[in-house]
Regions:
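Enriched for short, Lys/Arg-rich terminal
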Residues: 2-5, 9-13, 17, 50-84
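N-terminal first-folded block
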Residues: 6-37
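A short, surface-exposed loop/turn module that caps and links secondary-structure elements
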Residues: 27-53
Length: 84
């Protein structure tokens, strides 16, 4: 699991409890893969992209290319600025 530089930068602006949830999500992505239906408002955005809410105001978006082991978290930030 890889966090892009822009996602890491936005994550630093999150409240501590939300950052802890992001770390938990990253751990679960590492263990279980890109499908995370137990997370709040989880949905598949496209064939290879997914998102969930870390809290009411904060979301994470990630992608996993077919036949790839890499999961890239490309957005972790406010819901208002989410790229979907």
């Amino acid at each position: 699991v890889e966090l892009t530089k822009s996602a890491a930068k936005k994550a630093r602006q999150m409240p501590k409890s939300t950052r802890q949830d992001l770390v938990l999500l990253l751990e679960e992505l590492e263990k279980e893969g890109p499908m995370q239906p137990e997370w709040s408002n989880y949905s598949k955005l496209s064939k290879n992209e997914y998102h969930c809410h870390l809290s009411y105001s904060w979301v994470a978006c990630w992608r996993n290319e077919k036949n790839s082991l890499l999961i890239e978290v490309y957005y972790a930030g406010s819901r208002e600025n989410a790229p979907y």
